[in-house]
Design a protein with these regions (language model features):
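N-terminal amphipathic/basic leader segments beginning at the initiator methionine
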Residues: 2-38
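Glycine-rich phosphate/pyrophosphate-binding loop regions near the starts of catalytic domains
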Residues: 29, 35-118
């Protein structure tokens, strides 16, 4: 028999679970201020719950959108100017919703990075 292959861990691939957990602990103080009475659960879960019970909707239909900043992040990195990236991200998603006639109720996020420095 040959030697046993070593299992690859998250840490081996550059993922620092501890740093990620520390980052998630800091988010509620910022994000919770955006919640309204319809948000059922908070940050850190893998899915979110939003109640339509308090909405006055005659024909309820949920519309979701998820968009990224695309190549604009490359320009931000090259110029070291990140000031508009977050605003642009939110604006692009809201624009995708309102052009359908939908009312923005919540924001879906996706955070991706090569290394988390907190």
């Amino acid at each position: 028999m040959g030697k046993k292959d070593k299992s690859i861990t998250y840490k081996d691939t550059g993922v620092d679970i501890h740093s990620g957990n520390e980052f998630v602990k800091k988010l509620p103080s910022i994000v919770n201020s955006t919640f309204d009475k319809n948000v059922i659960n908070g940050i850190g879960d893998f899915a979110a719950l939003y109640s339509l019970e308090n909405e006055q909707l005659s024909n309820p239909l949920l519309v979701s959108a998820c968009d990224g900043v695309g190549t604009k992040i490359k320009l931000a990195i090259d110029t070291k100017n990140y000031s508009g990236i977050g605003q642009d991200l939110v604006a692009m998603n809201i624009n995708d919703l309102i052009c359908t006639g939908a009312k923005p109720l919540f924001f879906l996020d996706y955070l991706s990075m090569s290394k988390l420095n907190i």
